[in-house]
Amino acid sequence: MDHLSLVPYEGGSAGGGGGGGKYKECMRNHAAAMGGQAFDGCGEYMPASPDSLKCAACGCHRSFHRRAAAGIGGGPVFFRPPPPPQPHSHHAALQGFLPSSVPAPAPPPQLALPYHAVPAAAWHHAAAAAAGRAGSETPPRMDDFGPGSAGGSGSGGGGIFGRKRFRTKFTPEQKERMREFAEKQGWRINRNDDGALDRFCVEIGVKRHVLKVWMHNHKNQLASSPTSAAAAAAGVMNPGAGIGLGTGLGTGISGDGDGDDDDTDDSPPRAAVSSPSPSPISV
């Protein structure tokens, strides 16, 4: 309660008119011990006797009552000026490198602060503490940065702080197994298939989230034409299928392709179709 002690005491009658001033309502906080705020609200100062300094209404000393000067309204309550702030470490280091002829910068003058005002030093210390907490995080590891990101030409374009993107490489067997599993599941992972998904990931040695990303990236590419994928798989399994059907030109296989033993063509004669001559192109 330092601001209450600033109320000056002037001699005079205890009725509140001594020294040309008048004492108003009581400003004592009766709930300060409990961490709250409660005032008596007794109004103007009412002494018990002419020589008493205690209020007969609330029992508080006259210093707890707000004093209003005669003819002048009560002004705002002021705190005492805070002590000058101590120089920071970087200021002290700077003063060590300055020549002796250059004086150190003087601290700004301290003015009286109004009621409920917060010193600027408190904001400065709070900002410094916040910056210290932000800079105390664990820095990233050096192996997260690739040599291509040092010049700012990496895929992330973040300069030296661009994180190198890790790409998983799959074997052909893993790709084929993942494609078969994705087609079996309809290129989507249901919640009821978590057990089968975990077992499949353990079998092929691929992590769960890696398989999900692969299915998401190849869904439109492989699932758009399932017939072509099946035909391609059949061609890989039986590469000799489809050879020898038709004329058999350049393959060394005889036969007319009608299934009988002779080499004669039993198909009906085809009508000769004359192709029209191309029209001349004018330049």
From Swiss-Prot:
Transmembrane segments: none annotated. InterPro entries: Homeodomain-like_sf, Homeodomain_ZF_HD, ZF_HD_homeobox_Cys/His_dimer. The keyword Aminoacyl-tRNA synthetase does not apply. Residues 131-171, 244-283 are annotated as: Disordered. GO terms for cellular component: nucleus. Pfam families: ZF-HD_dimer. A zinc finger (ZF-HD dimerization-type) spans 23-68. GO terms for biological process: regulation of DNA-templated transcription. Residues 257-266 have a biased composition (Acidic residues). GO terms for molecular function: DNA-binding transcription factor activity; transcription cis-regulatory region binding; zinc ion binding. Residues 269-283 have a biased composition (Low complexity). Keywords: DNA-binding, Homeobox, Metal-binding, Nucleus, Transcription, Transcription regulation, Zinc, Zinc-finger. Residues 148-161, 244-256 have a biased composition (Gly residues). Putative transcription factor. The homeodomain differs form the typical one by having namely 4 instead of 3 extra amino acids inserted in the loop between helix 1 and helix 2. Homo- and heterodimer with other ZFHD proteins. This is Zinc-finger homeodomain protein 8. It comes from Oryza sativa subsp. japonica (Rice). The lineage of its organism: Eukaryota, Viridiplantae, Streptophyta, Embryophyta, Tracheophyta.
